[in-house]
Amino acid sequence: MQTEHVILLNAQGVPTGTLEKYAAHTADTLLHLAFSSWLFNAKGQLLVTRRALSKKAWPGVWTNSVCGHPQLGERNEDAVIRRCRYELGVEITPPESIYPDFRYRATDPNGIVENEVCPVFAARTNSALQINDDEVMDYQWCDLADVLHGIDATPWAFSPWMVMQAANSEARKLLSAFAQHN
């Protein structure tokens, strides 16, 4: 895969430039554009993934299906499709917006900061997973209600962005509705 960049944003969310992805994520990470996607199968189960230990931020942490950064000139929806192919080896239905204005800042135990405007999407797949070990070390298809209960009971066991997304009542409602409509 070619070198990825992040799209830097000002406080109003307006693009101001780009920076190489790995150079962008430091203890002083600038605000940038990302996306987060929750992927469901035909049974309405959510794919929960565990980030590879080689990941710079939050290695080994359980999270929602796929996250990433759109590239300059790339629509968020197209970036979701690209990363699902790259990380999971799957084709997906067109991503649907769940939480378009999600924004967060969090620091991992190693001091790496995520500082993102990060629209949240949901999509479906019927494809068999072909996991990219550089991205994902483990995965599990789970009932959404069980995952949400797990997040509520043990938020420390999941990525902070997943916890914050699930804490939004409207996003939670939309994810539940999405899971139920196979």
UniProtKB/Swiss-Prot annotation:
Binds 1 Mg(2+) ion per subunit. The magnesium ion binds only when substrate is bound. Its cofactor is Mg(2+); Mn(2+). It comes from the Bacteria. The keyword Transcription does not apply. Pathway: Isoprenoid biosynthesis; dimethylallyl diphosphate biosynthesis; dimethylallyl diphosphate from isopentenyl diphosphate: step 1/1. GO terms for cellular component: cytoplasm. The active site is at 67, 116. Its main location: cytoplasm. It catalyses: isopentenyl diphosphate = dimethylallyl diphosphate. It is found in: Cytoplasm. Mg(2+) binds at residue 87. Pfam families: NUDIX. Coiled coil: none annotated. Mn(2+) binds at residues 25, 32, 69, 114, 116. One of its GO terms (molecular function) is isopentenyl-diphosphate delta-isomerase activity. Keywords: Cytoplasm, Isomerase, Isoprene biosynthesis, Magnesium, Manganese, Metal-binding. Residues 30-164 form the Nudix hydrolase domain. Belongs to the IPP isomerase type 1 family. This is Isopentenyl-diphosphate Delta-isomerase. It comes from Shigella boydii serotype 18 (strain CDC 3083-94 / BS512).
